[in-house]
Amino acid sequence: MTRKNTTTNPWAKFHGPNLGYVIEQYDLYVTGAGSVDPELQELFEIFGAPSFQDDVVTGDNTATHFSPQNTGNIEKILKVVQLVEQIRSFGHTLAHINPMEDAANGQSLLEKAMNELSDADLKAIPAKTVWQDAPEGIHTALDVIHRLKDVYTKSLAYEFSHIQDSEERTWLHQMVESNSLRQPLSNKKRTALLKRLTAVEGFEQFLHKTFVGQKRFSIEGVDMLVPVLDEIVLEGAKNGVEDVMIGMAHRGRLSVLAHVLEKPYSHMFAEFKHAKIEGAVANSGWTGDVKYHLGREQVVSNEEVSTRVTLANNPSHLEFVNPVVEGFARAAQENRKKSGLPDQDISKSFVILVHGDAAFPGQGIVSETLNLSRLNAYQTGGTIHVIANNAVGFTTDSYDSRSTKYSSDLAKGFDIPIVHVNADDPEACLAAANLAIQYRMLFKKDFLIDLIGYRRYGHNEMDDPAVTQPQVYKKIKNHPTVRAIYADQLQAAGVLNADEVETITQFTQEQLKSDYAQVPPADTSDATIHVKVPDVVAKGIQPIDTGVEIDSLRAINEGLLSWPEGFNVYPKVKKILERRKDALEENGKIEWALAESLAFASILQEGTPIRLTGQDSQRGTFAHRHIVLHDTDTNETYSPLHRLPNINASFSVHNSPLSEAAVVGYEYGYNVFAPETLVMWEAQYGDFSNTAQALFDQYVSAGRAKWGQKSGLVLLLPHGYEGQGPEHSSARPERFLQLAAENNWTVANLTSAAQYFHILRRQASILGTEAVRPLVLMTPKSLLRHPLTLSTASQLSEGRFQPALEQENLGTKPNKVKRLVLSTGKMAIDLAAEIESGKHEYNLDEVHVVRIEQLYPFPAEKVQSIIKRFKNLEEIIWVQEEPRNMGAWHYMAPILFELAGDKVKTGYIGRPDRSSPSGGDPFAHKAEQELIVAHALDVKYNFRQDKQEIEVFSN
């Protein structure tokens, strides 16, 4: 029996979907059709049917008491609740977000739900029954539906239902459903917005008419991109952001440069005209780049606030700038002037990435970069993504470029809120921008704006888009610009009259003409096919003493082998570390990993921060580094490099995600923005680095020549043929050597721990100077602990890096030497092992071996001085483990030919040309390697006559 209590109403706390559930449960309770939760059953027994004293207003302005039990409206209430949630979740399918379409084409789901409810049904249900936070003036469910349709199905459309965090979801819905997001703009701001659109349109049209046929990749059709960026930058500045980093491709870039980054029109025109004007291409390198690839840095001020805006230099490789700019932001956020990990302040900077609608789902680098967004080593506190969506990629329609409804759908998998907005509705676009920046500042996470417009012209201005999209371009031809649409709206609202609109247009035109008049005639007087590399780059890295006193090294080593009391180091690791205890004593030997740690510590003590990332970099792929220790009982971590004395620079080492391209781009960007930091990326195996080839090609090797963008990034690429097959043998040194020119980077393949120590310290010493350049290191695998690569303390404390080393105990009888063998890396160690084994019958008086430690720039003077000692030299041989069409041979061949002169022959010993880097049979590999070594050291062996496929001679 129901014991109805009328003094309190527990149902008041139930709203929306929760209320629908309670009503449904009461129906089951009354009919006995199913089991009801005991707690709810008790509530029903005490309080009866769910009922609400609410504001369904009657004719005499009194509130009626609404009870589902009395009206039989349970089913209808449930349908309304479901409809409300469907509008929130799927309203975007009804929204008018595409200016080239009259209406949305995905209406069936919501239409079906709405057709099941009459207006009378909706009027009978109180608003707060289905919407707890219904604003003032919303009384009935009908009002609710009208209001929510107005919010979710107009020029703005939202996708929030995939967001996992309920707090974020609630905040987002409250923001868009309240009046706070779309407060009417003041007349002053509306006029300013029209002026901005007039400037954007006027600039593009001026270029179109003045520089006919020249590529500019017009913004027209998504003109609102500029005001959207303006708004985000301004709101960021108001929140105290010091740096805003922008990454974008070429579409609309010139307009963004001219307006958001305030690049003078005269400078833009000078680049089109090939005229000399001071500062026109201020950030260009010696080879330069096309105008729509160049970046800019500018302090932007507005409304008494300012911030530095950086538009990153960018190649036409779409989206590859994304991780680079994220690296910029992280570097700007971190304080590296203390020991331990750097301090990150995510309020200092944020990133805006402008994507293309075809590139966002099409380029894998996008998802790789999105995956970095929540990772401790890479997160930057939230990126604002803007898809400049013109619904076509070159000539490819969207149905051929993606498998999803929206170009933004990829972002759903990363829990990113999405707003679609019609680019022909300027005020809606600004509302989207405001929501984006508020969300980023509050939740420190990514946000995406899908700015849907069109492309007024072809992919470039010489292209006729009507050839492939004839129907849509008929529409576009007759479609008014967003400036014209907004001008009409302001006139209709009485904000401006026609004369005032015309005055704004004329002012823009006069400004453009005036700036164009400042540009002198074209000047090709200095045009030349010979590009002059700056002297400081051309002369290369000068010799630098990089030794560290033995006492300092011993003190460092002691610190490296200590950890907090009670910290339980894994026994196997502890044993490895304890072996290093006496490494710096008189008879001690220093292996590769210890030399690295000693180099790191000494670099830190000199005030240079270090950042090292890569797959498995904390331990090291080959279980050699152990720079981060794990407590066996608590899994807490500890790095001795964080506790060493006399350090005032940060050290961070992170295991990266299973990505090469995004991580390389990120580390490159970090180093560009933190030039004082030794930034290192380590491949798990060098073989896998080629998935970042675009970054090596477009940024690391060429960034300074194209853009004047300096980097000292270090690439650690494990390399060496050990019979492990084609995926675990080669870092493809031939590719880095092919890209080597103009002293753009250093490529090395070292053979001792001391050499590694010195080259790291040399690299640290050139950071922040004009001599800086990237360092590409082919690092060892089996050589990490090889006896012939170990070094002594004196080798670390004295001298410097040597670009070439002579094999000890050879060449002692110069007049007898007939063959000079050059090799590098593991091949050189294999030769040394054979020489020192004493198990051969070669006449080693006739052979001398030189290890080329630094492949590029080639140490020609050093090698030439060695050659001059051997008056009876007959041949110079290059020996390598890679196939002939790989490795260093094709780089070395012309160098050897020049060194040899007319009287000395040159030759190659190694594997023949092959399509795969390495065979898969370790026994075959071993046999080949032994044959290469034997033939290289046996002067009597006439390999020019031999038909075996193990070596090839080339004169």
UniProtKB/Swiss-Prot annotation:
Which InterPro entries does its entry note? 2oxoglutarate_DH_E1, 2oxoglutarate_DH_E1_bac, DH_E1, KGD_C_sf, ODO-1/KGD_C, THDP-binding, Transketolase-like_Pyr-bd
Q: Does the keyword Oxidoreductase apply?
A: yes
Query: Which positions carry the signal peptide feature in this UniProt record?
Result: none
Cofactor(s), by name:
thiamine diphosphate
**Keywords, sorted A to Z:** Glycolysis, Oxidoreductase, Thiamine pyrophosphate
UniProt record, GO biological process: glycolytic process; tricarboxylic acid cycle
- Reaction(s) this enzyme catalyzes, per UniProt: N(6)-[(R)-lipoyl]-L-lysyl-[protein] + 2-oxoglutarate + H(+) = N(6)-[(R)-S(8)-succinyldihydrolipoyl]-L-lysyl-[protein] + CO2
Family that this chain belongs to: Belongs to the alpha-ketoglutarate dehydrogenase family.
Its function, per the record, reads: E1 component of the 2-oxoglutarate dehydrogenase (OGDH) complex which catalyzes the decarboxylation of 2-oxoglutarate, the first step in the conversion of 2-oxoglutarate to succinyl-CoA and CO(2).
What HAMAP family does its record include? Answer: SucA_OdhA
Record-given protein name: 2-oxoglutarate dehydrogenase E1 component
